[in-house]
């Protein structure tokens, strides 16, 4: 298989949090590494099975982001308007090599992977979780942090994904009991890096009990569990 690794300038294209700068950053595609060669036929179809991560419709090209064997891959998704996939779904896709033009680089043509077709072959844990847990998560944040509606939505989906896939036994008990969950949102510095920190837990009589702290790196779109006994962040797959 030949893949073009598409590098995303990901302040997530959905106008992330910012207290001072409220401009919207968009994903751009940088031709940093390509395994496609210029003689690759544009009519040849490739196929494989991936795990769906998310859609990104905010750049010069719409993207579908997928994962396989702990590696991330992005495909041009300009010819597909279906947005029915949920993170964690297994999908069989077909793609081909075709031309894109890199913005800000003199419109230089490059080969990239274009999605041709996809078929969901298995629901992920998040899709199954949504069918059984019918409560909405509540959330609150500190007023000094300003977040866009798109960022709130993205954080909500991250928390859903975490809850659906978490091995935290206490959290599993609350889900089994259909207990309401909520989370706090704040910004924190750790080791010189800014994270959005989510305090996930339950409330009783106005008092919140935290079950798990989550750290989100918006630049890399990485979610971490906080390991309290060892005071370290553990990447959540």
Regions found by a protein language model. Name each.
Residues 180-216:
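Exposed beta-strand-loop-beta-strand "reactive/processing" segments of non-cytosolic proteins
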Residues 98-130:
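OB-fold/S1-family single-stranded nucleic acid-binding modules
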Residues 20-22:
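Bacterial signal peptide processing site
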Residues 15-18:
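C-terminal motif of bacterial Sec signal peptides marking the signal peptidase cleavage site
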Residues 79-94:
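Short nucleic-acid-contacting surface segments enriched for D/E, G, S/T with interspersed K/R
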Residues 134-184:
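Short, non-transmembrane alpha-helical segments in secretory-pathway proteins
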Residues 96, 209-237:
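A short, surface-exposed interaction/processing loop segment used at functional sites
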Residues 28-60:
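Structural detector for short beta-strands of small beta-barrel domains
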């Amino acid at each position: 298989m030949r893949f073009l690794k598409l590098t995303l300038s990901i302040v997530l294209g959905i106008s992330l949090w910012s207290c001072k700068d409220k401009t919207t950053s968009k994903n751009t595609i940088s031709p940093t590494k390509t395994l496609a060669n210029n003689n690759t036929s544009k009519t040849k179809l490739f196929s494989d099975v991936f795990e769906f991560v998310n859609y990104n419709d905010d750049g010069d090209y719409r993207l579908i982001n997928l994962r396989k064997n702990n590696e991330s891959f992005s495909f041009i998704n300009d010819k597909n308007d279906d947005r029915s996939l949920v993170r964690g779904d297994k999908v069989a896709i077909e793609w081909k090599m075709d031309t894109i033009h890199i913005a800000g680089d003199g419109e230089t043509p490059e080969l990239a992977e274009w999605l041709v077709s996809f078929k969901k072959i298995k629901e992920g844990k998040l899709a199954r979780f949504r069918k059984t847990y019918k409560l909405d998560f509540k959330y609150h944040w500190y007023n000094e942090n300003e977040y866009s509606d798109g960022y709130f939505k993205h954080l909500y989906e991250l928390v859903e994904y975490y809850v659906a896939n978490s091995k935290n036994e206490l959290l599993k008990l609350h889900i089994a009991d259909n207990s309401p969950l909520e989370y706090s949102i704040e910004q924190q510095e750790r080791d010189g890096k800014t994270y959005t920190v989510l305090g996930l837990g339950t409330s009783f009589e106005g008092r919140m009990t935290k079950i798990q702290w989550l750290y989100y790196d918006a630049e890399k779109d990485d979610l971490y569990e906080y390991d309290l006994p060892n005071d370290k962040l553990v990447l959540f797959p």
